[in-house]
Curated annotation (Swiss-Prot):
Name of the featured protein: Thymidylate synthase
Cellular localisation: Cytoplasm
Entry EC number(s): 2.1.1.45
UniProt cross-references to InterPro entries, sorted A to Z: Thymidate_synth/dCMP_Mease, Thymidate_synth/dCMP_Mease_dom, Thymidate_synth/dCMP_Mease_sf, Thymidylate_synthase
A Pfam family per the record: Thymidylat_synt
Length: 322
């Protein structure tokens, strides 16, 4: 039995049993706990959940997108990754350039109105096609604001900061781990108090701290808000992957990924799905392969990252709260 996965299942059950009933921005409602933590020993295996299928291709393409410093969804769509579609789509339908059917509250309406769901899909397909094939449209509606990749790779400085106009936090982090591994300042942040609150979806995983001890590199990530059924399994795998990649490029073995979450919630319309997941058996965790020929964190491609021996229960679909 995997303690890595069991702690996720145990926490899911605790949220169901003890979580406070809260309203939320999306109008969906949640069961919520505040201040939770899971610790994943990466020597046990790669923590990609097995009680439901988690699509690793989406995780690695999103992380590569972050590491590119990108905040336009075209790269994701080119890799058939639609994780961020809804937030860019919302920007389009709320603009004066949109002339199609009324898309108000499209997230909730598409779940309860079969006819509207078809209309929504038609408009979404138009949007995706335009992002992929129309450069002007991509420039106007493909950006999702000052989030992750943009903040990681090109944090904008102010007039009081000497030197470059932007800070590449990731490049600096790699240098710091190599040169001052005992530093307590091995930090990567994605929360800018000035610009982040105005983003379509303000950063959820906001702070990461790396830690070197006994020849191993560990990582703790603080997440202000965790959608426990849909989002958190991706976050666990994504930051475990990031830890593996940074360790490979700095000469360390991997240690622990420590996941600390503020508002840890299960949406009311995910309760049936996570209850189904809790009834399923676990399988042995898979292994991660990284191409050892890659010499820079920024040179990895989709083909350089693979998951091996992944055996899981089937996927469980659930609506995204937007």
């Amino acid at each position: 039995m995997s303690q890595n996965e069991q702690q996720y299942l145990d926490l899911a059950q605790k949220i169901l049993d003890e979580g406070s009933h809260k309203g939320d921005r999306t109008g969906t409602g949640t069961r919520s706990l505040f201040g939770t933590q899971m610790r994943f020993n990466l020597a046990e295996g790669f923590p990609l959940l097995t009680t439901k299928k988690v699509f690793f291709g989406l995780i690695k393409s999103e992380l590569l997108w972050f590491l590119r410093g990108d905040n336009n969804i075209r790269f994701l769509l080119e890799h058939n990754n639609h994780i961020w579609d809804e937030w860019a789509f919302k920007k389009w339908i709320e603009s004066d350039k949109y002339t199609g059917p009324d898309m108000t509250n499209f997230g909730l309406r598409s779940q309860t109105d079969e006819n509207f769901a078809k209309i929504y899909k038609e408009q979404k397909d138009i949007f995706v096609n335009n992002i992929l094939n129309d450069d002007e449209f991509k420039e106007e509606f493909g950006y999702i604001g000052n989030v992750y990749g943009k903040l990681w790779r090109s944090w904008e400085t102010n007039s009081l900061t000497a030197g470059d106009e932007t800070v590449d936090q990731v490049a600096r982090l790699i240098d710091q781990i190599k040169e001052t591994p005992n530093s307590r300042r091995l930090i990567l942040t994605a929360w800018n108090a000035e610009t982040t609150p105005q983003a379509p979806l303000p950063s959820c995983h906001v702070l990461s701290q790396f830690y070197v001890a006994d020849g191993k590199l560990s990582l703790q990530m603080y997440q202000r808000s965790g959608d426990f059924f849909l989002g958190v399994p991706f976050n666990i795998a994504s930051y475990s992957l990031l830890l593996h990649m940074v360790a490979a490029q700095t000469g360390y073995e991997v240690g622990e990924f420590i996941h600390t979450i503020g508002d840890t919630h299960i949406y009311n319309n995910h309760v049936d799905q996570i209850t189904e997941q809790l009834s399923r058996p676990m399988h042995k965790l898979p292994k991660l392969w990284l191409n050892p020929e890659v010499k820079s964190l920024f040179d990895y491609t989709m083909d350089d990252i693979k998951i091996l021996d992944y055996d899981s229960e089937p996927a469980i679909k659930a609506p995204v709260a937007v």
